[in-house]
């Protein structure tokens, strides 16, 4: 617009400055005869007298033609001038536009250079932080190596002190042996000198007795030394035999040269008789004590049972507790301790982490350590009622009587007359409608099969005198089974345990004599439906094909049937759960690294098979993982909480709390990755014997998650339903604390952005050192656990990826 206005002003100026043909004073005349150049204009001023003449001339035709030519000339000049002005204005516009573009490009280039400098500074800061982190890690590794070397030196010094003590004890034992031999030799010489010829025989017997006593003392000392060092014991035996032979030959070289061999034989025979006599007296004292507490018929049957059981082979794997008890009573205390120690060592030597630890062999089923059960969570989810949880703590109800000798429970043989037990709850005799001969025969066959009895808790002593054929359950819906009872085609062998949903017993198939485990579901409609759902899932898992060289590592269901309004599921037998294995062989110290590797590979194979079956287990924990007798194969059991992926419900109480994934607590959509999280928690517990996330509440669990794994992503928190229970509107974690004074729960902001705890320090404390090869494997285990416990379920490792992890490869 500015340019157009300038052009119009120029046009107006030109029009005002150009002469017109109507101007009477100025006339352009072209005179070719004059000396002026072409294009010059003469201005002629006419007088008033000549105006008339000129006006008359203008009226003539020739004058009109000259005026028209002059007008066309002026018009052409004006057109040229306008074109030039228009062209110059357009060129100036292009020049301005081009200058403006150049300035814009310069500004853009300057911004680009500024951004490049900013990126360069940012990269420099990042490199500086990375170098600082590397230096910090290097210092941490250096400190860890220094601590490891210090621990190794301390262990080496401890071993040297132990060797020093052992050598001093060996020297003391040798000196005591030599002193006893000298005293023995002098005493035997003096006794022979003072003996008369008629008391020769008595004197020889006395020397035999003296030598027997010294031999027993030496044998006892040798037993003590054997526990400390077997090699030194063998040397002591050799020296003792040489000294004894030389001294015997010296003492009797003049009279009886063959007597030393006779003395040794008589010593061994006397020692055997003494041990038998002590055992007989011990049994007699026990029987006298037992006779005071029990009626005479029970005593006679017990003694008969003991005589039968004393002839059985105690090394058999199927030997029940009663047989073991009588064999224990028939041994001396020192021999008993040695035998138990050797048997335990032969079983657990490959699975202990520390064979010299006293805690590794401590095991008590009644130990009330802190554990996590899903029963309270089932109550919160509405699956079970309050009285169902209380019913779990009640003892298993059977009609088997027991007695206790030296804190060992022994099943008594069946008696012709009913015996009243100490418990007040009356229980019927479910075999009362059968002939007594058949009942006695079945019990007799069971005793012969079981070796005379089974281990039964003393709390299950009941009164079998009640006869109610229409009532098979107790008040809580548990089936009141009886040892020896035949259910369908299976004969009950012994009780195993009871839970909220069922009672578990061991049994044998009557035709094939095959060992099985029967799960007897409680007589409740909801639990019956859960049992049917478990059967359906087990059938689906068993029908899913596996790889040719792999196993499913899931418990196999053999049969199922209904018996007296109870759904019964038959499984293959296994030894114990991994929870019991850790309590027995690795309490507070865990299992060996190789055992954890073997178990981890089998667990991921099981997860892979379960995922291929489109099933979520939703309750993986050491209690639901069983191991075989050889302790080299594990299987996942208890699919009562399992289901298909489309059946999953958003609830914060799914899975046992210590093994519960964060997406369950936050109310986020979950899938098969919750089982991977549970397996990661189990692996840490296998190696340490302790819980990785021992939270008391869901809020406490989230705090532990963030301390070990860092903060949650805001994207995940925004998609969760229960995020308001644990985070504020700014997505800051709110820690729940209990006010001890007001007894109220208050929420305190507890912002955690980075991990404050390390899983490697949880696996290996600072005061523990392991070999370098095991350290490499332990770092791989830590990496596998971290990938299994990633907070985001979409980034968590899958079972197939875990099977290719470095930790699962052999050493």
Curated annotation (Swiss-Prot):
UniProt catalytic activity: L-seryl-[protein] + ATP = O-phospho-L-seryl-[protein] + ADP + H(+); L-threonyl-[protein] + ATP = O-phospho-L-threonyl-[protein] + ADP + H(+)
Location comes to:
Nucleus; Chromosome, Centromere, Kinetochore
Tell me the organism: Dictyostelium discoideum (Social amoeba)
Can you give the residue ranges of the Protein kinase domain?
490-808
Tell me yes or no: is Oxidoreductase among this UniProt entry's keywords.
no
Q: What is its EC number?
A: 2.7.11.1
Protein role: Serine/threonine kinase involved in spliceosomal assembly as well as mitosis and signaling regulation.
Q: Does the keyword Phosphoprotein apply?
A: no
Which UniProt key words apply to this protein? ATP-binding, Centromere, Chromosome, Kinase, Kinetochore, Nucleotide-binding, Nucleus, Serine/threonine-protein kinase, Transferase
Record-level GO BP terms? mRNA cis splicing, via spliceosome; regulation of mitotic cell cycle spindle assembly checkpoint; spliceosomal snRNP assembly; spliceosomal tri-snRNP complex assembly
What ranges does the record list as Low complexity composition bias?
46-71, 310-327
Among CDD domains, the record links this protein to: STKc_PRP4
Q: Where is this region: Disordered?
A: 1-257, 288-341, 353-379, 408-452
Extract the GO molecular function terms from the UniProt entry. Answer: ATP binding; protein serine kinase activity; protein serine/threonine kinase activity
What are the Polar residues biased-composition ranges?
A: 203-215, 241-257, 293-302
Pfam families named among the record's database cross-references = Pkinase (PF00069)
Write the protein's name: Serine/threonine-protein kinase prpf4B
Q: One GO CC annotation, please?
A: kinetochore
Instruction: Tell me, in one coarse class, where this protein mainly resides.
Output: nucleus
Per UniProt, the ranges with Basic and acidic residues bias are 81-202, 217-240
